[in-house]
Amino acid sequence: MAELPTSHLAAAVLTDGNRALVAVIAVVALAALVLAGVLVRQVLAAGEGTDSMKKIAAAVQEGANAYLARQLRTLGVFAVVVFFLLMLLPADDWNQRAGRSIFFLIGAAFSAATGYIGMWLAVRSNVRVAAAAREATPAPGEPEKDLALVSHKATKIAFRTGGVVGMFTVGLGLLGACCVVLVYAADAPKVLEGFGLGAALIAMFMRVGGGIFTKAADVGADLVGKVEQGIPEDDPRNAATIADNVGDNVGDCAGMAADLFESYAVTLVAALILGKVAFGDFGLAFPLLVPAIGVLTAMIGIFAVAPRRSDRSGMSAINRGFFISAVISLVLVAVAVFVYLPGKYADLDGVTDAAIAGKSGDPRILALVAVAIGIVLAALIQQLTGYFTETTRRPVKDIGKSSLTGPATVVLAGISLGLESAVYTALLIGLGVYGAFLLGGTSIMLALFAVALAGTGLLTTVGVIVAMDTFGPVSDNAQGIAEMSGDVEGAGAQVLTDLDAVGNTTKAITKGIAIATAVLAAAALFGSYRDAITTGAADVGEKLSGEGAPMTLMMDISQPNNLVGLIAGAAVVFLFSGLAINAVSRSAGAVVYEVRRQFRERPGIMDYSEKPEYGKVVDICTRDALRELATPGLLAVMAPIFIGFTLGVGALGAFLAGAIGAGTLMAVFLANSGGSWDNAKKLVEDGHHGGKGSEAHAATVIGDTVGDPFKDTAGPAINPLLKVMNLVALLIAPAVIKFSYGADKSVVVRVLIAVVAFAVIAAAVYVSKRRGIAMGDEDDADPEPKSADPAVVS
């Protein structure tokens, strides 16, 4: 690894012109928040339907608010602890330390606010979508309604709800980064590390907690309701139905919004750190200019989702909005690049690295092509994920056919599809990263900055992507409210069924793109980590390469310590995924026992003479989700600390590389296999292979219950895991070097920190493994025999 000069690190300054540009970008971010407010008013202006629908929606709202309030109180304590720990880490001065800790809290607050706002509006718009679909069924004596108009109205309400969440995501992300740059100028990249960590930590907890809640309720509801009792999904007789609908909002809405918000924040962190080195003064503003363009085009894309009569389905209108946004983004970025950036590397003020300043070529070409790679990558992943998860494509149809031979072949078919699709998606992301890397030529910093710019290119589509994702749970909840109330029938029910099918596809597609944003953000952060090692080594007077360079500073994979780090990084991804899935299994078991108890002790539930106790299941899911948060979170934070202080920063870099590689493949495998099982179930429920109630249907329900924690808990949680570990590594790298070399070298301190980190991980995993599989384990007096269903006895 070639040693780089470090004098350029303080050379870049925020010029008056760039300060004005960043201020304008901040105004664009505020405009996104204003537009979100306008969209909120439009959504809430729609009708709410019957009293029965309003009562069900109110129960969902109450459950979602109660869960998120308890979760945020829990995370608030954790955030305060991290605030003070960040003050202990090395920085150039106390102003930087204080700024890093303060903006950690701001990043955490923005991430939580994005998730909360997404959930708050989703639980209010779902009943409005159901009410809009209800208009399709005419009252006695009324003429037939225009189904296309009714469907378009319902689609617009659902997508505008997503648009609000999308605008808050990009608006708050961009506003936070702009505030840091305006306040701290050239020191902004260091302070932004705290902002990114706050966003990433809260997003990971919301992803894990929301995922456990939603899938415990979903799996429990399906196993007892569909498989054992033979009643439909969202049937009001199922005690887990309200919890299932609450989970859709706290998991898919709040979790995904926070996830993409932190991808946004973390990518900007990496782009500004590397931009300052690679593009000097211009590097402090250009990484903000690209996502600002994305904010403007997201506004266009959201309003472009206006269904037409010629559309084959609601997906046609959504795809149209996405591609219009992407194309306009590319055109505007091209204009911005050639207007803002100079035509020669020598004209990049603030760059003192001779390898960059003396480079021939045009920096505008590098910037434009790198951003274009990110935009094109988003479009390609959208199509690739759609191919493996849509009901109209061969892979899902093949899983549907396999249901004729039982649940085992359904599970096997889904696993093989997930494994295969992971390869293609990983290759596509890898090509994107490598293509951007090649743009840098002989300069490693330019190459890494190009990767970060590809990430910002991907970010230009985030506003529309969040809108697409939120569309899924809103349409799913709308169908649930309609079915529980019994007030939407005939054509109206079909409108909601069609919307739900589109929503399943949008959720699967956005998971694929979210994984790509996570990987590009992690890759860019990896570049920032390399820069941190370079700076830290120079501070203690050590070389990074050549004769006499310490082995623990080099990321040479032929060294045993680095190979161990690589394997450990991959292993953490597997352990994290296992913990998340096991948490769902335990909590789902508790839900199954509770729903069975209610059916057994309240026989009147089946003939509607008694009402289930919905609140009991909501309480179980809330308790278990919050209880299970600690172990995955501590693993993500403590594992890099243990590796870094034990094996050194070189092995820690290899650890991050192993985590990024394994995490990419694992996340895609879990997301696509789970999505394909879900849509195979929908395919059978639409009347194929025997339809609802058939053995094929029961087989696909089992497949779907296996896939639920795959696609909605473990898979999505890997995204913030990668970025949390990268940010922790980035923050501790100077401390690891400080206590390993130079005047402050201390083996005792390193060993003490490593032992504490390992003890915390071991204790967290031990406590997690000691918990029972289900609450029935703790109730030996239960005379009922345990189910022999292998999907229940997990």
Swiss-Prot record:
Residues binding Ca(2+): D678, D704, D708
Catalytic activity from the UniProt record: diphosphate + H2O + H(+)(in) = 2 phosphate + 2 H(+)(out)
GO molecular function annotations of the record: diphosphate hydrolysis-driven proton transmembrane transporter activity; inorganic diphosphate phosphatase activity; magnesium ion binding
Residues annotated as binding Mg(2+) 2: N245, D248, D476
Annotated positions binding substrate: K215, K711
Positions of transmembrane segments: 20-40, 74-94, 102-122, 163-183, 194-214, 264-284, 285-305, 321-341, 365-385, 422-442, 446-466, 508-528, 564-584, 641-661, 717-737, 747-767
Keywords, ordered alphabetically: Calcium, Cell membrane, Hydrogen ion transport, Ion transport, Magnesium, Membrane, Metal-binding, Translocase, Transmembrane, Transmembrane helix, Transport
Cofactor: Mg(2+)
Subcellular localization(s) per the UniProt record: Cell membrane
E.C. code: 7.1.3.1
Residue sites binding Mg(2+) 1 per the record: D218, D222
Sites annotated Important for ion transport: R207, D252, D259, D712, K723
Designated name of the protein: K(+)-insensitive pyrophosphate-energized proton pump
